Amino acid sequence: MKIICLGTSAGLPTKERNTQTTILSLNPLYNEYWMFDCGEAAQHQILHTSIKLGRLTHIFISHLHGDHIFGLPGVLTSRSFQGGQDKKLTLYGPTGLKQFVDTVLTISCSHLNYPLEIIEIDHGDEFVINDIEITVGALKHGIPSFGYRIVMPDTAGNLIKEKLIAEGIAPGPVYKEFKLHEQVTLNGKIYNTKDFKTAGKKGKKLVFFGDTMPCENEVSLAENADVVVHECTYLDGDVELSHKYCHSHIDDVLSLVSSGSVKKLIINHVSNRYTTKDINRLLAEINTKTECEVFIADDFYEYDIE
């Protein structure tokens, strides 16, 4: 699995950065992509990658500001011609998202050749998709804004075939029973299958935040996360100014990941006032202030989730 940042700019695109779009590639667990926000020209950014729109199955919108949704009409309509025919797409987002999509498609006389479901979300909503758990949390911004906590399913350990053979259990269909179940009864004997497996892995916890200033719900969403993708429009300067515009300051974000024991922080939604030189300097300073691994994403940054 990997996270791919297709757009990382705050508010407006720049020559180096597009507006907000993030992809979660679920390969090899599932052969599909999820998108978090869909900024202007998102489909153009996709052309620079190996991502296939036909394998995009779910889009999660944090809020309805233009830099997070103006790419939707292009992505939705182009998907019809890029392998998406007859493949359902589900769109999640705040109240008003359905009206936005319906209006754009109607006025432009656009017709999709696949089923589109639009689910308008609220705080505390929970969904399960392919055994992946999604929790929605309300944030604090100028308009309703949400974060999404994604918990991947646990993965079972691998069979230790040598142990089974040593126990006199020959390879065959029974091995599948040992892999799937906690106990197996064979020839009148009960086996605890954990004795014949390597240790399993806990599912990764990933959190994708929309625009927000500090709020209580952030803390519960981020708790013990393996990866947090968080806006940080203000990488330095006046904390109060960032809150005036309902955005996060770097001090806010570092406090969040510290209190939540977050392992990896990916910063996006970077103000266009910061040059590449500024970002490199600030990142070096940031990494002296936290034990969490921090990276300020640029467009097409990829992070492998092991």
UniProtKB/Swiss-Prot annotation:
Give the CDD domains listed for this entry.
RNaseZ_ZiPD-like_MBL-fold
Keyword list (alphabetical) reads: Endonuclease, Hydrolase, Metal-binding, Nuclease, tRNA processing, Zinc
Give the cofactor binding note: Binds 2 Zn(2+) ions.
Catalytic reaction equation(s): Endonucleolytic cleavage of RNA, removing extra 3' nucleotides from tRNA precursor, generating 3' termini of tRNAs. A 3'-hydroxy group is left at the tRNA terminus and a 5'-phosphoryl group is left at the trailer molecule
Quote the catalytic residue positions: D67
Positions the record marks as coiled coil are: none
Q: Which GO terms describe its molecular function?
A: 3'-tRNA processing endoribonuclease activity; zinc ion binding
Instruction: Kindly give the Pfam families that the UniProt entry links to this protein.
Output: Lactamase_B_2
The record's EC number reads 3.1.26.11
Binding annotation for Zn(2+) 2: D67, H68, D211, H269
Which cofactors does the annotated protein need, by name? Zn(2+)
Where on this chain does Zn(2+) 1 bind? H63, H65, H141, D211
Q: Quaternary state and partners of this protein? A: Homodimer.
**Protein family according to the UniProt entry:** Belongs to the RNase Z family.
Q: What does this protein do?
A: Zinc phosphodiesterase, which displays some tRNA 3'-processing endonuclease activity. Probably involved in tRNA maturation, by removing a 3'-trailer from precursor tRNA.
The name this protein carries in UniProt is Ribonuclease Z
Please tell me the species this chain comes from.
Macrococcus caseolyticus (strain JCSC5402) (Macrococcoides caseolyticum)
Could you tell me the gene encoding this protein? rnz
